[in-house]
């Protein structure tokens, strides 16, 4: 007899726009919601609380992390809710672990939470070092990996993170969900890693991650 299917919805780049809550069909019955970053736009007072409550009312099982457009108070809030994923690891199911790293490399816009490639790489390595044994691994990272289908801006330039790409090449997580580059939603592969950028949540894009009979699968939805 087949095991029950467990499902997680991964999305990001909410930017305080909550229309996605009503257009993602699986949101209520999913085993959890994973948010890769950019919950707010510069984190004005009350913004993260409003986004949290709107999602929580649909599904209270949330893991989330800071993006480059969020300020440090977002991480403080998520830690208070025991939902922070940035620089953390969690076990979603037996043998299935997730690790998260938020922020982004520097942008031309001087957004609140940017770090160097070196720092991003250190964070990835340090977080992975805490993860322990696993059978399959999900990486939730705000910045998309460099030189993929997921990091191309309108002029055709690749603007993703080399550190993220290097980490994926080295560790080969089974599933990677990124974001940050709104106009480059899609999926790609790096080695055996399947990598996804669902785009802005307000566009209805998300990644449906499923676990059935011990096997992780993922599919880009809503794009």
Regions found by a protein language model. Give the residues of each.
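Short hydrophobic-aromatic micro-motifs
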Residues: 9-10, 96-101, 195-197
